[in-house]
Amino acid sequence: MKQLLDFLPLVVFFVVYKMYDIFYASGALIAATGLAVAMTYFIYRKVEKASLITFIMVAVFGTLTLAFHSDLFIKWKVTVIYALFALALLGSQWFMKKPLIQKMLGKELILPDLVWNKLNMAWALFFTACALANIYVAFWLPQDVWVNFKVFGLTALTLVFTVLSVVYIYRHLPREQK
């Protein structure tokens, strides 16, 4: 259910973009993301920090897109969010006792520190690559291509990387956790 709520704003953005334009889609994205956060809180009585950060970024960049009637802001939002996630992961690796990935999943999984560090670094590099790919697609290709890349390309890449991460984790789990 939670993943469905997280995915809802993306679907709304895509449908409204195809029916109208990037500006209606940006407004719909703000509303849908706010609704998803509210529903998550209503159902689970908590909202993850990443979801709150995403909502704030959507609200800020979406509002700037509407206020200045420029799609540059909504395009930059994707890059900024991915860059923030990458920086958070890298910062946790270098400045905290445990990598952020371990803090998020360490209660459910027992893995060696080296595995947590590699997994954390892999996700940081993945988010960095997504941020850079978004810059290229958003600013050198037509808007329709960017919307499709944002909705389908980045989503597919994230799903594939998640599956690869699960396989990597599974290979390093103790026998009793498999």
From Swiss-Prot:
Mode of membrane association: Multi-pass membrane protein
- Identify the main location: membrane
Quote the gene name from the UniProt entry.
yciB
Residue ranges spanning the membrane: these are 22-42, 50-70, 72-92, 121-141, 149-169
| Protein name per the record | Inner membrane-spanning protein YciB
Q: Which UniProt keywords apply?
A: Cell inner membrane, Cell membrane, Membrane, Transmembrane, Transmembrane helix
Protein's job? Plays a role in cell envelope biogenesis, maintenance of cell envelope integrity and membrane homeostasis.
Family of the protein in this entry: Belongs to the YciB family.
Localization, UniProt = Cell inner membrane
Known PANTHER family for this protein? INNER MEMBRANE-SPANNING PROTEIN YCIB, INTRACELLULAR SEPTATION PROTEIN A-RELATED
